[in-house]
Amino acid sequence: QTLLQELPIPP
């Protein structure tokens, strides 16, 4: 798992 996968990233 990675933080980028966990955090909601805006497009």
Swiss-Prot record:
The keyword Secreted applies. Its main location: secreted. Signal peptide: none annotated. Keywords: Amphibian defense peptide, Pyrrolidone carboxylic acid, Secreted. The keyword Signal does not apply. The modification Pyrrolidone carboxylic acid is found at residue 1. It is found in: Secreted. It comes from the Eukaryota. GO terms for biological process: defense response. GO terms for cellular component: extracellular region. Expressed by the parotoid glands. This is Bradykinin-potentiating peptide Pb. It comes from Phyllomedusa burmeisteri (Brazilian common walking leaf frog).
